[in-house]
């Protein structure tokens, strides 16, 4: 982000410009239409975000894995010494996946496909549970494709083949048919 401000400041030399006040305000967010997965290719962004985005920040470095922002809540500690150091995850994503959650017991390799709304998947391998990034609602083709990409990627990086698959029994849910 500093490169954007450096450019907007006229490419000053040194570092004094970093401490100076600036009237420039940029609000940037992930590139995705409401309810759809993140757009990861420049040409796709230019096509799908027309009429939504005021401007584009493009780069020649490809995004390989879609991963939205994590949302956490700080937790109070009884004595306030470690306040906020153990987050409560509202949405586990960038920065926290696929960091494993330790389980008490060893078991079979399981792929859990999550629900229809606010979807995420989980792979259990040994005594570790690996949650995927936030996928979102499975109410459009792009989200279903993202679910399929996520399953393929997580199984590949963990080098596992599930012995059991857990899914919702509703016959019309996309995760039931995966």
Language-model features, listed with the residues they occupy:
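Active-site-adjacent structural elements in enzyme catalytic cores
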Residues: 1-178
């Amino acid at each position: 982000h500093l490169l954007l401000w450096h450019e907007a400041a006229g490419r000053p030399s040194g570092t004094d410009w970093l401490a100076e006040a600036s009237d420039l305000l940029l609000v940037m967010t992930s590139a995705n239409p409401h309810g759809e997965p993140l757009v990861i290719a420049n040409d796709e962004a230019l096509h799908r975000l027309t009429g939504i985005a005021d401007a584009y920040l493009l780069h020649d470095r490809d995004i390989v894995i879609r991963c939205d922002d994590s949302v956490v809540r700080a937790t109070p500690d009884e004595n306030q010494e470690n306040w906020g150091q153990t987050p409560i995850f509202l949405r586990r994503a960038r920065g926290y996946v696929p960091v494993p959650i330790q389980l008490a017991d060893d078991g079979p390799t399981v792929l859990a496909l999550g629900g229809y709304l606010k979807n995420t998947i989980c792979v259990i391998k040994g005594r570790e549970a690996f949650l995927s990034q936030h996928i979102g609602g499975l109410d459009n083709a792009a989200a279903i494709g993202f679910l399929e990409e996520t399953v393929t990627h997580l199984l590949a990086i963990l080098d596992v083949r599930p012995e059991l698959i857990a899914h919702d029994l509703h016959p019309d849910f996309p995760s039931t048919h995966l």
